[in-house]
Amino acid sequence: MRILIVTPAPPRSRSGNRVTALRWARLLRGVGHRVDVAEVFERQRCDLLLALHARRSFPSIERYRRLRPTAPLILALTGTDLYGDIHTDPEAAGALDLADRFILLQPHGLGELAP
């Protein structure tokens, strides 16, 4: 499977989102997937979009969903998303609606999502 991981952190950044994206790319490649990491989705060929950070990746999430309405989209919710943005920012909340699945790494993250 060809996977595109979108993270708002630029290449050379040492932010948690970039480190996570690179780590996941390495793990996914290790099990046979073709993986690219980018700051934005710009019509790159991929079978799946995995986006980190709901608010900051929303333009990529929205574009991907518009261009590929049936392709899978996974959203990894960061601490900033869970404990702030998804409750106050319309784009972050919109990203939740567009995703097919979520990845939650925060211990109490599930409690932050509406039932």
Indicate residue ranges for each PLM-predicted region.
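Short, well-ordered alpha-helix to beta-strand connector turns
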Residues: 32, 46-47, 99-100
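Nucleotide-activated donor-dependent transferases that construct or modify glycoconjugates
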Residues: 1-12
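A short, active-site helix/loop in glycosyltransferases that binds the activated sugar's phosphate group
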Residues: 100-115
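Active-site proximal beta-strand in glycosyltransferases
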Residues: 48-50, 64-83, 101-104
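A conserved, positively charged/aromatic
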Residues: 82-100
